[in-house]
A protein has these predicted regions:
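Extended carbohydrate-recognition surfaces in non-catalytic/accessory domains of CAZymes
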Residues: 5-74, 130, 135-138, 150, ...
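An acidic-aromatic loop/edge-strand motif
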Residues: 11-14, 28-49, 96, 107-173, ...
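Accessory beta-strand-rich segments of carbohydrate-active enzymes
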Residues: 13-20, 49-50, 54-154, 180, ...
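Active-site-adjacent substrate/metal-binding segments within catalytic domains
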Residues: 34-62, 69-86, 92-95, 145, ...
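Extended acidic/polar, glycine-enriched regions
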Residues: 110-113, 174-253, 618-621, 635-639
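Beta-strand-rich structural segments
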Residues: 173-176, 562-568, 582-585, 627, ...
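Substrate-binding/catalytic cleft of secreted carbohydrate-active enzymes
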Residues: 174, 286-297, 301-536, 541, ...
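Short flexible loop/turn segments that cap and initiate beta-strands
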Residues: 184-189, 222-228, 579-581, 587-589, ...
Length: 747
């Protein structure tokens, strides 16, 4: 058998999409929900999904039959209940919207020069099926794959490391070879110069193992995310399979806590949903990378992919940028949280979906744990222990190198009843329940815990718990980023507005997203983000913000996931002479605050003050200045809006139809200070080799369609997202408003 090419080609371009009686041309990734306005009157996804339409859609694409003994289509994610047809014949299907799947289309392809047609039918009409914004459609990449009949299996290279020291490390490579031919076959597998012959019967798969040594290994860590590459060759394939991996070791116990590469490490984590904010569920690589960059900049070292498998690009970014990950499989199990959620699939699909996640992701050094569930409803039933064991067993069938966890919670007094459930887990996940740690540790001194969800306002208490008790190895705030769906979580409200929590009867129809993130939809870090980062890290020594006076816009009421409205603003017109609180965050022992160069006061700062100094003073416009040791920060009253300032996150776009640029729009005064209360209607105009993907603000009550060219700034900010075309050339983005036109160019 001669060597043949094994190829993988991006299959995102040139689709025709039909929905709601209309057909349009689209390039993937695609989410049809985000092109609609959130509408509480008609949105089938309800308050959980942000009031979007969902429904059914159909994608079609014509393509020539490629060369290769086997031809497959690999889908990174379709939401949801996908059926794949080729030339009128059903080739495959997949139900769960968050796991990848592959369809062998070889038997259905034309053998002549006729073009083939693939049709993907997407059914997201059974609502409600998700507790957050899922999006609808082929929202992740699709790949066209070709390979010989005898080939390296999908996800068939598994790299682990052992015997790690500063002098050397052992690399273990397990290669699974698959024979899809009707006859027996043989091939030679080569890894790093070592060879083994493998013989396979028709339809058989076999694994062969290799090991080699790296001298003076460069260890992977969040501070130094160094990656190696191993090349695997098969004699029937004429190109090697390259796999990136990291050399790192970690351990956890009740005495030393979490230890990475021999060094204790406190885990400062964030829960992050799958959506990409203003562009909805469309999982462009650049959007996924941006999420990781934002979390890294906010001081986090751990992300929990709540509550579903994430994308390949997201994990690649975590590997290369240095971010630890808990990979989560499911939200719920057998008892439904929503009428059409995973409870309708679990018995028939759980093993397939867990394998899809773990097999794809197990080479990522960023992943330190697998999570099998979140706040399952049936948690008090004894049968839940059996379910947990089955799910854990499915994980261990693919990867025995990482601990299995699960997030549990209780809204009543029956906590100890979960002990048999916790016994199944390697690390116990506590949602909002870490205050039970002392009694639980006394009852079960071997239990290692982490808080898998916590309220944003509990930042100091949660940091202190992890800092003081090694058996509590980390905390994960809900959430790192604002997200679509779970409408109104994190909101505060004023007297006269609809009261209550986001989950109140009827939901919060004024909202279509959750504002509990440390970082908002535009990428702006809220003051709570700076405070949290100051607690956990040493690179944010001083920060200052101002608490909104109660009564300035009305009497303020908080909800469970909210923090008091606090802003980088010294613009409080009409409040002159009235008391206002200025907060300064630092680990320095003393802070001085000045207003207009006059000393307001000096305050001691320590753990007893939660590393926070609060000054109450009568409001007067001008400039605040805080000093702590050698550090100084200022906050000045902004003048009237004078212009728009546009700032892009990159200077060049790649002409591949996949490259995104995020352009921040800020309303500034003549001195360049952001006007923190500016709400100015704007229109974006994109010329050249890019198209507009989205224009929106962080206001999750704004009903403007996010893909429209119109948006109103919120707190002086908005964000524009543009997508490259397939042609090289300059891109010009202009924004019109009542202020002078602002323009920025990108190559």
């Amino acid at each position: 058998m001669g060597a043949q090419a094994q190829t993988q080609q991006l299959f995102d371009n040139g689709w025709h999409f039909s929905h709601d009686g209309k057909t349009i041309s689209v390039n993937l990734p695609h989410d049809w929900d985000i092109s609609y306005a959130s509408n509480p009157e008609t949105g089938a996804t309800g308050t959980d999904g942000g009031w979007f339409p969902a429904g059914k859609g159909e994608y079609r694409k014509a393509f020539a039959t490629p060369k290769g003994e086997l031809v497959k289509l690999h889908f990174e994610g379709v939401y949801q209940r996908a059926e794949v047809f080729v030339n009128g014949q059903k080739a495959g299907q997949h139900a769960y919207g968050y796991t990848p799947f592959t369809v062998d289309v070889t038997p259905y392809l034309y053998k002549d020069k006729r073009l083939n047609e693939v049709v993907v039918k997407v059914d997201n009409s059974q609502q409600v099926n998700c507790r957050w914004y899922s999006g609808s459609g082929i929202y992740r990449h699709v790949w066209l794959q070709t390979m010989p009949l005898l080939h390296i299996a999908e996800n068939g290279v598994f790299v682990t490391t052992s015997n790690i020291s500063t002098k050397e490390a052992t690399v273990n490579v397990e290669v699974t070879v698959q024979n899809e031919a009707a006859n027996a076959g043989q091939a030679i597998v080569e890894v790093e110069g070592k060879q083994q012959q493998v013989e396979l019967q028709a339809g058989e798969s076999k694994s062969v193992c290799f090991s080699y040594t790296i001298q003076n290994p460069h260890l992977w860590s969040p501070q130094d995310p160094y990656l190696y590459t191993v090349n695997t060759k098969l004699s029937t394939q004429n190109s090697p399979c390259s796999t990136k991996f990291g050399v790192r070791s970690f351990s956890y116990d009740t005495e030393k806590g979490f230890v990475l590469n021999g060094k204790p490490m406190l885990l400062n984590g964030a829960c992050v949903h799958h959506d990409d904010g203003v562009i909805g569920a469309m999982a462009f690589d650049d959007a996924e990378i941006r999420k990781v960059r934002l979390m890294k900049a906010a001081g986090f070292n751990l992300i929990r992919t709540s509550h579903n498998p994430t994308t390949r690009a997201f994990l690649d970014a975590c590997d290369s940028l240095g971010m630890l990950v808990i990979g989560e499989a499911f939200d719920g199990w057998r008892t439904a949280k929503k009428p059409y959620d995973y409870s309708t699939l679990i018995d028939s699909c759980y093993r397939e979906d867990i394998h899809a996640m773990v097999m794809r992701d197990r080479n990522h050094p960023s992943i330190i744990s697998w999570s099998i569930g979140n706040e399952v409803i049936e948690r008090k039933e004894i049968a839940v222990v059996t379910t947990a064991r089955k799910l854990k067993a499915a994980v261990l069938e693919c990867d025995k190198t990482r601990p299995v966890t699960e997030a549990l919670c209780a809204w009543d007094r029956d906590w100890e009843i979960y002990d048999p459930h916790f016994e199944v887990l390697d690390i116990a996940g506590y949602n909002y329940m870490i205050f039970k740690h002392a009694t639980d540790h006394k009852r079960d001194p071997k239990r290692v815990m982490w808080q898998t969800e916590s309220y944003p306002r509990g930042a100091f208490r949660n940091w202190a718990t992890v800092h003081d008790y090694p058996y509590v190895i980390g905390d994960m705030v809900w959430t790192g980023l604002d997200y679509l769906g779970e409408s109104g979580i994190g909101r505060y409200y004023y007297e006269g507005e609809r009261p209550g929590e986001s989950y109140a009867e009827g939901g919060q129809p004024d909202w279509h997203g959750a504002c509990c993130g440390d970082v908002d939809m535009t990428g702006w870090r809220r003051p709570i983000s700076h405070y949290r980062s100051m607690l956990w890290n040493d690179n944010e020594p001083l920060y200052m913000a101002v608490k909104e006076p109660n009564g300035y816009h009305g009497k303020i009421y908080e909800t469970s996931w909210s923090v008091w409205p606090t802003w980088e603003s010294w613009n409080w017109a009409g409040w002159e002479g009235k008391p206002i609180d200025v907060e300064v965050y630092t680990k320095a022992p003393e802070v001085k605050l000045y207003l207009n160069d006059q000393l307001v006061g000096t305050k001691k700062v320590s753990r007893d003050t939660e590393f926070k100094a609060v000054f109450t003073l009568p409001y007067e416009a001008g400039t605040l200045r805080a000093e702590a040791g050698d550090e100084t920060v200022t906050l000045a009253t902004a003048g009237e809006p004078a212009r728009l300032r546009l700032t892009a996150d990159r200077t060049k776009l790649t002409a591949d139809g996949q490259s995104l640029a995020y352009i921040t729009v800020e309303v500034v005064d003549k001195e360049g200070r952001v006007c923190p209360d500016a709400a100015i209607p704007c229109e974006a105009i994109v010329k050249g080799q890019a198209t507009l993907m989205a224009f929106a603000s962080a206001d999750l009550k704004d009903r403007e369609i996010k893909t429209s060219p119109r948006a109103t700034t919120f707190k002086g900010r908005a964000i524009i997202v543009v997508r490259s075309t397939h042609k090289k050339g300059k891109v010009q983005v202009s924004v019109k408003s009542s202020l002078p036109v602002a323009t920025i160019s990108i190559n």
